[in-house]
Amino acid sequence: MELHVLNHPLVEHKLTVLRDKNTPSSIFRELVSELVMLEAYEATRNLSVVAAPIETPVAPMTGKKLAEPRPIIVPVLRAGLGMLDGMTRLMPTAEVGFLGMKRDEEHPTQQVTYANRLPEDLSGRQCFLIDPMLATGGTLVAATHYLAERGAKDVTAINIIAAPEGIKYVEEHIDPSIEFKVVVCAVDEKLNDKCYIVPGLGDAGDRLYGVID
């Protein structure tokens, strides 16, 4: 597993405002989108490209375009949806799938899958899993293996904040045959007894969309 933690003053500034409990949902959503675009620049560094002959107004040349099959972006519902706009603005030609998973509150590293909208065959596809928080790591491992069951061998996870416990769990449980990378804005101190990241930013889904009782 490859882990990349962004080190940039803009990321630090935006992340500080994002964490602030007084930041309203409207600003929170904008900041998530902006942070994801900064992360995506790093996460997409190794996208497959092919030669593309074109003509400029001055002369013919050979440039590069994204190769087929197109990469696929997979937000983990519901909080991952808040990251989708930033990803599609950077990669408008990418396909988008959806995966609904939630943590079993009695068994934090176990996941319940309640929805999916994905191609049956992901062979040869570069997959980008997006979810704001990497807490216990259970959701990320389960989601990655879900993609791998459909043939995915190249998976990049984009998370805003991670906990050390989650990173360790992912390192220990991810299938080593998968080319796997994690890009985060920050690795925080720890998980608390409720498996929330500390200092974290609270419940990302609630802060993006409001609390659902």
Swiss-Prot record:
Q: Which reaction does it catalyse?
A: UMP + diphosphate = 5-phospho-alpha-D-ribose 1-diphosphate + uracil
Q: What class of enzyme is it?
A: transferase
**Its annotated pathway?**
Pyrimidine metabolism; UMP biosynthesis via salvage pathway; UMP from uracil: step 1/1
Q: Which SUPFAM superfamilies match?
A: PRTase-like
Q: Does the record bear Repeat in its keywords?
A: no
Chain sites annotated for binding uracil: I197, G202, D203, A204
| Segment forming the signal sequence | none
Q: How is the cofactor bound?
A: Binds 1 Mg(2+) ion per subunit. The magnesium is bound as Mg-PRPP.
Task: Tell me the InterPro entries matching this sequence.
Answer: PRibTrfase_dom, PRTase-like, Upp_B, UPRTase/APRTase, Ura_phspho_trans
Cofactor (UniProt):
Mg(2+)
Which Pfam families does the protein's record reference? UPRTase
BP term (GO), one = UMP salvage
For whether the record's keyword set contains Cell inner membrane, the answer is no
The EC number(s) this enzyme carries: 2.4.2.9
Activity regulation comment: Allosterically activated by GTP.
Q: Which UniProt keywords apply?
A: Allosteric enzyme, Glycosyltransferase, GTP-binding, Magnesium, Nucleotide-binding, Transferase
Mark the transmembrane ranges.
none
Q: Which GO terms describe its molecular function?
A: GTP binding; magnesium ion binding; uracil phosphoribosyltransferase activity
The entry marks the following residues as binding 5-phospho-alpha-D-ribose 1-diphosphate, namely R78, R103, D131, P132, M133, L134, A135, T136, G137, G138, T139, D203
Which purpose does this protein serve, as stated in its record? Catalyzes the conversion of uracil and 5-phospho-alpha-D-ribose 1-diphosphate (PRPP) to UMP and diphosphate.
Q: Which NCBIfam families match?
A: PRK00129.1, upp
Q: Which family does the UniProt entry place this protein in? A: Belongs to the UPRTase family.
What is this protein identified as?
A: Uracil phosphoribosyltransferase
Organism of origin is Bifidobacterium longum subsp. infantis (strain ATCC 15697 / DSM 20088 / JCM 1222 / NCTC 11817 / S12)
